[in-house]
Amino acid sequence: MEAKVLNGKELSTKIKEELKIEVEDLKKNNINPGLAVIIVGNDPASRVYVNSKKKACAEIGIESFEYALEENTTQEELIELIHKLNKDDKVSGILVQLPLPKHIDEEKVIYAIDPSKDVDAFHPVNVGKLMIGNPDFLPCTPAGVMELIKESGIDITGKECVVVGRSNIVGKPMAMLLLAQNGTVTVCHSRTQNIDEVCKRADILVVAVGKPEFIKGSSIKPGAVVIDVGINRLENKKLVGDVEYESASRVASAITPVPGGVGPMTIAMLMKNTVKAAKLQAKMK
C-alpha cells in the first residue's frame, strides 16, 4: 500500500487563509499584529528562513519588521535591541533567527525576550507553561507536527508515540504535546540502544535528528504515521529528510514529504502565535 502524503504546504495555506480573515477582523478593532525578526550575520539558510517568514506575514496582513545586524554585533547590542522591541507596542512577537554567531550566548538572548512576545515559545516561562499543560504559545515545529497528525486521521489517545531526537526546539516539546493528547511517549536519542526496535513499536513516529535518511522503512511498523522533521541537503544538492522516504512510504499509512511537509507548517504556526500574542497583549492593556 502507498502511504497517504500529509501535505504541509496545502494545510499551511488553509491555516494562513483562516488567519488572514482573523487579522482583518482584529484590525477593525484596532489590533494590529506585528512581528519583529532579528537576523545576525549572513548565514544563507537563515536568510531563506527569514524571507519566508516575512512573506507569510505579508500574505496574512501581519506587519513585519526586519532587523538585519552585522556578524560582529555584540551580545549587549542585540539584547539592547530586544529590550527596545519588548516595549514597542507595534511589535506583538519577537523572533531571533537561530543559530547566532559563536560569540553570542543564545540562552541569554532568549531570556531577554518578553515571554508575552516570545512567539517561538523558547523562553523558560513558556517552556514551563507547556510542561504544566497551560501554554500561551506552542513551539512552532511541534505544533505544526500535531496539526499534520490530526490531518492523518489517527487518534493519539493510547497510541505508542516515538520521538527520535531530544532537542529543546523539537524533541522535548514534541513529547510534551503528544503526552497532552494521551499518547504513550518514548523519546530516543543518539545514546538509545536498539533504536530500530523502539521505532518499530511506534504507531506515530516523529523523527528530528538532523541526519539524512537515518530511519529506513525496515524500522517502521506497518501502518504507522511517520512525521519527518529533518531537512538535509545532500552533496548532490538534493533535499532529504531524516527518514528514507521511498522505503518508509511503502510501509507507513501516512507520511510527510521533505520538502513540503513540516517546514511550511512551522511558519504557519509562527503566524498563529503572532496573532495570538497580539490578542493577549490587547487584553493586558
Swiss-Prot record:
UniProt keyword annotations, A-Z: Amino-acid biosynthesis, Histidine biosynthesis, Hydrolase, Methionine biosynthesis, Multifunctional enzyme, NADP, One-carbon metabolism, Oxidoreductase, Purine biosynthesis
Record-level GO BP terms: L-histidine biosynthetic process; methionine biosynthetic process; purine nucleotide biosynthetic process; tetrahydrofolate interconversion
GO molecular function: methenyltetrahydrofolate cyclohydrolase activity; methylenetetrahydrofolate dehydrogenase (NADP+) activity
Positions of NADP(+) binding: G165, R166, S167, S190, I231
Superkingdom of the source species: Bacteria
PROSITE patterns: THF_DHG_CYH_1, THF_DHG_CYH_2
Record-listed E.C. numbers: 1.5.1.5, 3.5.4.9
Pathway(s) per entry: One-carbon metabolism; tetrahydrofolate interconversion
Pfam families: THF_DHG_CYH (PF00763), THF_DHG_CYH_C (PF02882)
NCBIfam families reported for this sequence: PRK10792.1, PRK14186.1, PRK14188.1
Quaternary structure and partners: Homodimer.
Function: Catalyzes the oxidation of 5,10-methylenetetrahydrofolate to 5,10-methenyltetrahydrofolate and then the hydrolysis of 5,10-methenyltetrahydrofolate to 10-formyltetrahydrofolate.
PANTHER family: C-1-TETRAHYDROFOLATE SYNTHASE, CYTOPLASMIC, C-1-TETRAHYDROFOLATE SYNTHASE, CYTOPLASMIC-RELATED
Designated name of the protein: Bifunctional protein FolD
Organism: Acetivibrio thermocellus (strain ATCC 27405 / DSM 1237 / JCM 9322 / NBRC 103400 / NCIMB 10682 / NRRL B-4536 / VPI 7372) (Clostridium thermocellum)
